[in-house]
């Protein structure tokens, strides 16, 4: 009954199966379509603020792909959050031979995670360290970009994210070293 009701909502167009993973994918794809329009609906500083917030989901997606590749999970099992890149780009990144190839795929649309991933890969190939350092660099870059905006709440939020990520990174690296 739940699936029938769900199929009659905005999610119905994306619902392709009867299992919980199918429902998750339908919700995420619908959300990606809705959220994906946000940067085109606003201009100026508001557009940059939206982009900076969506980049966080891109970081999550890249980390999820790195883990999936390392463990042999298929792309279809990776739940992508709505960010600044289309699912096709993430699929191409997943299909890359290695993390350096993923960075190359992300560099084509000029994504800032490409540069961050390349820099981290020069330091380490250990997946846990790659993830931790990638997040640390990413949040530092995003916080720097937010400083140029006249959005104090966003700047404060991203500064808090940087502090939290620095703590998380320190604990992860302490545990793995």
What are these regions (language model features)?
Residues 1-177:
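N-terminal domain-start signal
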